């Protein structure tokens, strides 16, 4: 059984077995008797590595044994192993030649937080969002068959990710094409079944064996000539399996379901995987694991220990903290509770982001008006549309990167019908160490083109609160997009006061240059304004724009500069350029925003500097354009 550890080691532990398993090829040379100790050492190494860098923690601890078993039984990387989401892939990275680079995890030019094809041949599919693994592995299985290759395809998906419709679309399709593939359900929340034990493990070994499979097919041929007898035999088998396993749904879809088995029992895992590796057709293995397994604090509180921050070295003085305001998500959570108290029609909807979007207090105070739909963004948006049709006032709290998954529902089910749905869009812009899969780089571009949509970008906490109220009372769909992290500590007015729609605010009057800021780069723009004696405008609204102010600024300044933490292509700056072009106004415009490439993981400050969105970068870009115009 796995050892249990109680502290994160500050000094690298001795790992004599892991030292001999730097790659899956080396791992497969170990004797099975050594694998239990390998699991203990790998768990310690993971604790040590993530303690140095920070990162996702609990999920990886829960799949130590499963990761070892998969690489031990299958011929990776020739056999294609696809991890869903990737939170659990740190042990996989350690075992696939990247152990010595784990100290660079989630750092600029270091290892990514998730599997990336460009990082290793063992990362067969890039992930970050959930529920994609089965579709990807199915595509690989089909490709192998068409190319005449014998390689296997394996998808590892969690019980949470299995709630998404995309996963079931793939589960439904795979039997139709007769794919030779394996889906491993990593059930770490006991959400499907708690029926795990010796009898279930024993049954899994029997049902996954080639002998059983051959006998079953032989019996089917014989008994098929006697329809009554075959039906009795089939029902008896299903009844016996149904008493022990919850696999009826997967069997009905056409999968050979095995499990549930203990995901921390290495001998059972290896024996079952070996049996299933040799079976044809779509195979489904249900393993039950414990999130945070082997680390006592994470086992006791898996939510808190889902991810951790970097630990400071022993004896080091605590890093000084700059005074900051509340997190933007906290501002939203407080506003939601305040507005719910004022309006009983309000409902709050989230796709499995209660903690991240700060709906915890709302869920406790208003449980009947709180809806966590799990990882089902499409359903979340159309659920809100249905509520709005009946006079409720739904607020959808969702990360920018995940709203992309429900774009059709946003247009077809909400916007076309002009329904009153407010989208509180968290994690807009660059998010730091999680990298491009989690960045909110495109929401202004894909929202502002939707007819009737109100789109707002706050520059501080108080402005955000007022924008949420503005959007809530707006007749039609509205969106407030705000970044990860804390604001500049603006004084927050407790009242639920809206803003005048489409009205920008001039924060500094200058000459020659006008900086038009959409969002949280306002402090940096004010620094540049002081350095260049430039006008600085908090634009607030991306749609509708403050057209009267834009006409005035275009007529009184020699250069307009738009600043946004969104893709330059199609973003707020594009809206300004389109408006001026339609007005027939010819004025030089400089667009500053996210470039036409994916900005890789790093600290947020490093990413902003790379994109020229810090104060220094904005000033350099403006001076360069003025020089090019002969206006320096």
Curated annotation (Swiss-Prot):
Transmembrane segments: none annotated. Gene3D superfamilies: 3.40.50.920, 3.40.50.970. Pathway: Metabolic intermediate biosynthesis; 1-deoxy-D-xylulose 5-phosphate biosynthesis; 1-deoxy-D-xylulose 5-phosphate from D-glyceraldehyde 3-phosphate and pyruvate: step 1/1. GO terms for molecular function: 1-deoxy-D-xylulose-5-phosphate synthase activity; magnesium ion binding; thiamine pyrophosphate binding. Its EC number is 2.2.1.7. It catalyses: D-glyceraldehyde 3-phosphate + pyruvate + H(+) = 1-deoxy-D-xylulose 5-phosphate + CO2. Thiamine diphosphate binds at residues 87, 128-130, 160-161, 188, 295, 377. The keyword Thylakoid does not apply. Keywords: Isoprene biosynthesis, Magnesium, Metal-binding, Thiamine biosynthesis, Thiamine pyrophosphate, Transferase. Mg(2+) binds at residues 159, 188. GO terms for cellular component: cytosol. It is an enzyme of class 2 (transferase). Binds 1 Mg(2+) ion per subunit. Catalyzes the acyloin condensation reaction between C atoms 2 and 3 of pyruvate and glyceraldehyde 3-phosphate to yield 1-deoxy-D-xylulose-5-phosphate (DXP). HAMAP family: DXP_synth (MF_00315). Homodimer. This is 1-deoxy-D-xylulose-5-phosphate synthase. It comes from Stutzerimonas stutzeri (strain A1501).
